[in-house]
Regions:
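Short, hinge-like loop/turn segments at secondary-structure boundaries
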Residues: 19-21, 98-103, 171-173
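Class I SAM-dependent methyltransferase SAM-binding "motif I" and its flanking Rossmann-like core
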Residues: 55, 59-128, 177-179, 195-196
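Short, well-ordered secondary-structure micro-motifs
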Residues: 33, 66, 95-96, 138, ...
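Fold-independent oxyanion-binding glycine-rich loops
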Residues: 4-6, 23-26, 58-59, 88, ...
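A generic secondary-structure signal
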Residues: 43-46, 97, 142
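Short gly/pro/ser/thr-enriched loop/turn and capping motifs at secondary-structure boundaries
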Residues: 8-11, 28-29, 88-93, 115, ...
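A contiguous loop/helix-start segment that scaffolds small-molecule binding in enzyme catalytic cores
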Residues: 49-53, 120-204
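Class I S-adenosyl-L-methionine
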Residues: 1-83, 178-179, 185-187
Length: 204
């Protein structure tokens, strides 16, 4: 059993019941996440050629888990049998916790890809990987190009983990002032806005 990361509260329960290998060391070897995802995928596929294994990730394996997509592609190339088992995603947990219907529409974005992403203010948005104040500050500045500074956003921590989950509503300009809220369990929910700032060709 291999875990992409053991930086998740539920892993404490696993420690008491099963033996596993954490792949957090890959994050220390590479400079960017794309390299990390690729290296982890290569490692898992190579191990899969030698023996049956389980590769576990937090939440749903097809939601914001790039390693799974890379592994799937490599398995097809190498004729390795792969079984992807679904689970509740953090997106499901967030919407349930916030009391919002995802059928109203939403967009899922990665904080590290925000510069290249199209920000659609007319739909609800969830932004992942906001795990420290520096990233939060960059996200704030990017969003302020598209939203009003007074736009209300919600910092969500540990959605779906009852003993840890919290939600804090703040104005967009205040986002990076709440340093204690940012960790590997933090995501940002940005409700759709009626106001539009015309800053890009897409907005015209």
């Amino acid at each position: 059993i291999f875990l992409r990361t053991e930086k998740h509260p539920t892993v404490d329960q696993l420690k008491q019941q099963i033996d596993y290998t954490s792949l957090d060391s890959f994050y220390e070897k590479e400079e960017n996440f794309e390299e990390v995802y690729g290296q982890i995928a290569q490692f898992i596929v190579q191990k899969g050629k030698e023996e049956d294994l389980v590769f576990a990730v937090p939440g749903h394996p097809r939601v914001a888990e790039k390693t799974v997509g890379i592994i799937e592609g490599l398995c097809k190339e190498n004729n390795i049998e792969l079984d992807i088992i679904p689970s509740m995603s953090f997106v499901d947990a967030m919407y349930n916790y916030l009391g919002v219907d995802p059928a109203e529409g939403f967009k899922l974005l990665d904080a590290f890809e925000l510069e290249e992403s199209y920000i659609d203010t007319s739909t609800n948005t969830i932004i992942t990987q906001i795990y420290d104040p520096f990233i939060a500050s960059n996200v704030k500045l990017k969003l302020m190009e598209h939203y009003d500074d007074e736009q209300e956003v919600c910092i969500v921590v540990g959605a779906g983990i009852k003993e840890l989950e919290s939600k804090t509503y703040v104005k967009l300009y205040e986002l990076d002032r709440h340093q204690e809220l940012f960790s590997y369990l933090t995501s940002l929910y940005v409700p759709r806005s009626e106001k539009k700032l015309y800053n890009t060709v897409h907005d015209l």
